[in-house]
């Protein structure tokens, strides 16, 4: 079976160095806010190209902390609108609603799966204060058009970089293209920890200090609390693991790109829509294909020993937690959620495994996909 994702194989690529790093933390006796955290924050900020990196508990917390900090700094207020892509993973939207802000859902571009820049400006109202772009599936969502819209209307530009570690726009990394960015280091990500972890990156000194305080119970100084904060801190073990894996991120991403290139060149099936390959601008956290009968294709691949996943089966505006949005008409979002299927793509995959995946997708037809 070619699993969609095998975290044991992923970790084994750097197992010796990870074990050494973890042992160092365990033997050192400092498990929070120690050298490993400071070193990772320094290394990741330098890699991304920002002055600040603040480690936190997870990617959702990273986005939530950014928005909360902007509220504390007076840049946002309860009820303000934040434009977000309608087809994102729900965490991007949860961060907005948790801060009592109003998400404005904008349709994606069907070829890139990222927010359609041509639709942003018409969604702006007098209450709009920010645009949250999501580098979905590993592809850069930033465009000069989006940046110009934000400048013209005085809007914050926030990045959700949970799925695009190492992705670039020109010479700059995603995570350094807007005013601030949230990062997730969930184990399955291109840069993944051995548990939950996240980070905020920014060049804004005031924002960085406020995020760091809110994530530490609201405290800049021990036992002195400036805000009603929360506990969202990266632990020393995760920081040490991430510091090891960061050294190999570009190499691992290149392997992802090579596999994606192989799929793009060797999958030939008129029933399957392959992702666009514009300027090789994705780090391929996910390789998304679309098929009218996605379930039949998934069954066919499983019969061939290939596991797939769906990202994501239910659109945010169709979820029970956002029942008030169920009336919204978002046909492109709904099409993507009805048709998307993710193929195995990870840096540990062998050439033979990639060949089997491409061959099986190419062989699919409605008749063989509907076998019991």
Predicted segments, located by residue:
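PLP-dependent aminotransferase class I/II
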Residues: 37-42, 47-53, 60, 118, ...
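Conserved PLP-anchoring active-site segment centered on the Schiff-base-forming lysine
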Residues: 67-124, 130
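N-terminal "arm"/small-domain region of PLP-dependent enzymes with the aminotransferase-like
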Residues: 1-30, 35, 304, 344
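Active-site phosphate-binding strand-loop segment of PLP-dependent enzymes
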Residues: 111-193, 199-201, 342
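Pyridoxal 5′-phosphate
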Residues: 16, 76, 256
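Phosphate-binding glycine-rich loop
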Residues: 30, 35-81, 95-99, 105
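Helix C-cap/helix->beta junction micro-motif
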Residues: 99, 152-153, 304
């Amino acid at each position: 079976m070619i699993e969609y994702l095998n975290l044991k194989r992923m970790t084994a690529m750097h197992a010796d160095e990870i074990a050494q790093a973890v042992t160092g933390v365990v033997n050192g006796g400092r498990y929070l806010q120690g050298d490993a955290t400071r070193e990772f924050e320094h290394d990741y900020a330098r890699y991304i190209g920002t002055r600040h990196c603040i480690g936190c508990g997870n990617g959702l917390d990273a986005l939530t902390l950014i928005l909360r900090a902007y509220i504390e700094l007076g840049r946002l207020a309860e009820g303000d609108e934040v434009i977000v892509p309608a087809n994102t993973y729900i965490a991007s939207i949860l961060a907005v609603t948790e801060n009592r802000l109003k998400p404005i859902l904008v349709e994606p571009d069907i070829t890139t799966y990222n927010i359609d820049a041509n639709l942003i400006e018409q969604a702006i109202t007098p209450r709009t204060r920010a645009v949250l772009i999501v580098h979905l599936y590993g592809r850069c969502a930033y465009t000069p058009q989006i940046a110009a819209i934000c400048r013209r209307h005085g809007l914050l530009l926030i990045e959700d970089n949970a799925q695009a570690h190492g992705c670039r726009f020109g010479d700059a990394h995603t995570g350094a293209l807007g005013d601030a960015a949230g990062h997730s280091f969930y184990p399955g990500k291109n840069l993944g920890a051995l548990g939950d972890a996240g980070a905020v990156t920014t060049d804004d000194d005031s924002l960085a200090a406020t995020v760091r305080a809110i994530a530490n119970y609201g405290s800049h100084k021990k036992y002195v609390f400036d805000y009603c904060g929360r506990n969202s801190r990266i632990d020393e073990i995760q920081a040490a693991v991430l510091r090891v894996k960061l050294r190999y991120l570009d190499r691992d991403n290149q392997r992802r790109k090579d596999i994606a290139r192989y799929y793009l060149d060797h999958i030939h099936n008129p029933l399957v829509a392959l992702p666009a390959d514009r300027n090789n601008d994705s780090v391929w956290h996910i390789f998304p294909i679309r098929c009218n009968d996605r379930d039949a294709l998934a069954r066919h691949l499983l019969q061939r020993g290939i596991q797939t996943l769906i990202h994501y089966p239910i659109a945010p505006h169709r979820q029970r937690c956002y029942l008030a949005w169920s009336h919204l008409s978002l046909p492109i979002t709904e099409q993507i959620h009805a048709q998307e299927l993710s193929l195995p793509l990870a840096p540990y995959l062998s050439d033979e495994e990639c060949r089997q995946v491409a061959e099986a997708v190419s062989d699919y037809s409605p008749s063989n996909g509907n076998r019991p």
